[in-house]
């Protein structure tokens, strides 16, 4: 390489270096919010968050490179949830991911006009989050819990596990706006099975002992709720103490000693939420993105608890289980 060529090459390199730096600096970093309705990080939360991050990475969104996730742990206080949603909007964030009906409502009300990606919404149409699943028509879209199918199946599975069952209580947080939908969905299935359902509403944690005692002599269905999840160990202890077979909407109860859980796949909800984030960050409007419903459901059975309750789980039910605790 002669001197003239070397000088030309060096000059070209000097010109290219600033261009490369500017190109690197031009990468836009998006900030999104995540509102979670509890104050503690559970083992299941870690799995769910990893599913979200994996889904985002698969779509090209990498934390620290082109994405920042602002997580707010909101507990179960709706007012605090609204305040945190407003805080996220002020940062600002491009959108808020919100888990569960009460938190979704808080995100909508606390950050009006901001896109909200719903995760596992109980009844998004009935709660007036969206006009329809196919055409949401507002600032909210995301995943629905397929509540009617899941809740009806919980009733059916409980009746299979306890064939002589005639009555079951349904434990609900009276603050949850989707309760009417939940109870109606379960009642329809219970009627075909010859079961009587009793709605058991609680408002505060101090009412749990008396509420679960009302289910004695029958069984119990515990509807998903952040307050219940936070008190899952106590709730499970109460069901065992009262000798009440129970089914839950989260595997964390079964890990704590509950009899059974049946739910749509949490991993599916969180990974699918990533696809909604991707579309909105790329310019799509929530109003035009259809709400998605799950196709994968998971059954978990605690055989140690079944033995303690004196229940023999039918082989047909064991064969359907995704996980057995022995």
Identify the meaning behind each predicted range.
Residues 1-326:
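Short hydrophobic alpha-helices and adjacent helix-cap/hinge residues
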